[in-house]
Amino acid sequence: MAQNGTVKGFCVLLVVLGGLVLAGPAARAGEGAEVRGIIQKVEELRGLRTGHPLAVSTLDAVAMRGVVARLLERERGSETEAGWDDALHLLGVLRPGQRLAQVERGALAGQVAGLYVPRTRRLYVLGSGGSAPRAVVAHEVVHALQDAHFQLTRGPLAPRPRDHDGELAAQALVEGDATDVQSRYVASLSPLDLVGELGRTLGALPGGASAKTAPFLERQLLFPYTAGLRFVRALRARGGQRLLDRAFRNPPRTTAAVLDPARYLAGDPPPQAVRLPAGSYRFATSFGAEDLVALTGEGSLGRFWLGGRMGVGRRGLDMRLATRGAASVAAALRRALPASAAIVFHGRLVCVRIALDKASVRGVSCR
């Protein structure tokens, strides 16, 4: 997973939140023949074949936390991370003194059940006594197949710091595919396997509950799995495996297309171009339909979104959104953003400015 910079381009995480594995209970997986059996079943379900042996490491909770911490550390200090820190503070998502990397570590510490690292082509899965739940192995095997056939860190699936919305949409395709295969794999297990291995699966659940994560960040953490799963199932229902594989070569451009698969199936129109006010921005990226929904907590606004950008400069934060219902979007943003935010709209354009000194900004232009 790589929400807002979480291990972007280095690994894909299967996250366990609230004590629930996203795909449900699964059976035991050790080394050797059993793992090969899981790989063969996943290949059958996904319609892809591995081109090389897969390296699978089963870790205990302490070792898994160490792997995740090292991967998070690789991204520290980047300009993108600093830009997100500033933006999320100004938007009121982060509290004074908080840092995005700190929140991410807290949210993910002890909550990761498995990950695949494209750089090393290694799968790490959490297990008890040397055994990992089969569903976790299956999920990460899908990522290995995706990487072998479509390259998770290059081309259309590569990280895009200046297009956060497009990057999140592509991530939803990746995680939705893995979650879909994972759930179908679990459904293929016998009732005896499911019941008999429930205790082992619960024993392998990550521990160390994290502190409460801000709703915006929590939703973006789950979005690739939940919305991505619905998106992938819609593609498979329309065009089967061929359409899904085509989507990996032409990922959804926006989270609006993930939230509404009909948009993607109708040709996946690009977002409406939106320009920020003239000035120098040390950080600028797209602000998408999912960002709008996560920030306001109002799911219906996703269908209003047409395009958007956000930038942070010396003056503070500027945001421009093209929408179908500017008055409704502006009203929702007024409810969600700090009181210091100046929010106006003109026609279909919604304009937001939040000053670095938290002072109210007057006379914001929205032309």
Spell out what each predicted region is.
Residues R28-R99:
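A metal-dependent hydrolase signature that marks the N-terminal structural subdomain at the beginning
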Residues V42, A135-L152, A178-T179:
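Active-site recognition of the HExxH zinc-binding catalytic motif
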Residues H52-L71, P159-D165, V195-L205, P251-P252:
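Acidic helix-start/capping segments at beta-turn-to-alpha-helix junctions
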Residues A148-T153, L157-T201:
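Post-HExxH zinc-binding segment in Zn-dependent metallohydrolases
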Residues L123-A138, A169:
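Short pre-active-site segment immediately N-terminal to the catalytic Zn-binding motif
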Residues T80-P118, L276-L317, V329-L333:
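Short, compositionally biased low-complexity segments enriched in polar/charged residues
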Residues G308-R367:
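C-terminal soluble interaction/assembly domains
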Residues G208-R315:
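Pan-zinc metallopeptidase signature
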